């Protein structure tokens, strides 16, 4: 009886240990990458920081709009701050960073290790409410936004942004009309 109990205990222990050996993905909120993403959303545009934040070969998707390269995205970002909006804030900001193991499944059933050559795939997720005042229209804008940042070697190499662009597009159109006069 005693040997049977020992065998059962060892079997359960081994099963639990092997269960824990699979995927090792984890999530953080106070890590260095999450804190950099938080800093990115500071009310004033810190160009030296943003320049270091993004990799040169950055790819950005804003809804279905694709922007290739850090230089091109930084031009757009600077226009948002300098030409389109003032008093920009990201209210109710939440940021967390996902550290995916190579065994983590992707949307098509492959593993992260099969899709990416990196040892670990890192995505930070951020969401909150973008607020600001249109520089041309004077209208207060407020819309929810979700953004994802893929980091490699300490720099963001891919960014995804999802939001309803109606208010931003209205301010861009107002800016274009004034500029054409």
Model-derived segments and spans:
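Bacterial Sec-dependent N-terminal signal peptides
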Residues: 1-26
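C-terminal and inter-domain tail/linker signature
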Residues: 21-181
